[in-house]
């Protein structure tokens, strides 16, 4: 990983900074933080327009609202100008911002802590640093956002209790003023939320979620948002408390939104000792037997070896051994033989595990370390850990320990059934992707439901939408929204390419979507034997054989529209790939200058006239 950085520090004098006024390097983003009668507040503007109207910020610890009756004093500033590499959408990322420091004193107790803000040319972020010893309880935060009323907001909806657990909602939109009443699951929404104002795109998110509980957003009347946490009564932390960054991304267009580096730049650089050598972090594609069942050969030694053979013949780097291997009485013998066979064929293996079988924190997660030792010993390259189902402090601590312990054993990690990414891929580059997205497995679940209904002589209910019986194929509108919503935050293991179960989409749509989300580990859902043997998909297979999973450059074409049309161009070396998905016919023009004039050959894949 290459990282270069330049930091300039200087004292911030009240007479020279205009009080608490702050600005980004170009001056287009400006913010102000101030202490009012009831607490601490901030505002954010973009090119002179109010983006976040006066909103509260603050934290409550041990039932003390440290933001009330607080004094705020400027303490310093620095300019940050760094470049670094994060595996994914482009070769070089940048962290260029102005950081402002404020000392905060809670007058009734005399307790002193710090507020940090950072202003980028495409956003604003803040966090608190609270020194202390022993165990304290974070009861909540006063964090608030008040975006413009005249906005449309995109959010992830799932009409079941799973909505706030797995981040697997369908992306839809409503007016900002109705967000608090639109969902039958209540006013609490998952991050991110994306607002389309008359002049820009505004995304609310968080970054650097470590040693803390993940934040959700409670929508309120008047288009306001408030912080919400899994632990309604609070969560305990020891020692100094550092909150995640509370982030507002501000983008002039969808290309700027998709290419923002704010989330990763707010995360620490990788540990130079833990990641001194990163040659073992190898992105690539993976075949996967779970989605299709591989014609009855699922979790048989012969069937999984055939998947490995198919991967080798197609030049695909990995195969994923999913849920089911542990049910075999000879599970470790099975895994050992399969891993050895995969190694002989030049294919790496990922292996699945339920998180509850790893989550005992006793003896510094001895249970976890033992499992990782075992899979590393037989030659496994990565682990897919599933069903964390939440973002409370318990899940977040587990995830961090998993990434650290896996890195010590040179193992890649693919978290599933998990929360949104917050930039972990920079600090722990062995996180090769993560779920936290509504992906194509829903088409499989729907097919299972419909088959069960038919077998029982019943008609599938089109409105059925509960865990285990979700009759909800992924619609094209969801896919046309994902790159500009959940996809902005980081890699998403959507597991694309479902030719045989496309729902209401087409084969070309399924192939195109494989290029639209970042995922350095690109797990392909389709039956490996259909993929390699069905002549109908031969043109698609030609693309899949050489499809990169990391890119040098990503460009969103200007005709793109959230939920209707997503067209993205990506470059790897001297080759450009352009893919699009849509919900209705649309004309797309490739901007002049995007493709070099010297380009001499293009391959076009589209749906046949008969579908």
Question: What spans do the regions from the language model cover?
Answer:
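Glycine-rich, aromatic-lined ligand/substrate-binding cores of catalytic
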Residues: 499-572
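Sec-dependent N-terminal signal peptides
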Residues: 4-14
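Bacterial Sec-dependent signal peptides at the C-terminal "C-region" and cleavage site
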Residues: 12-23
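Conserved, mostly hydrophobic/aromatic
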Residues: 128, 311, 386, 413, ...
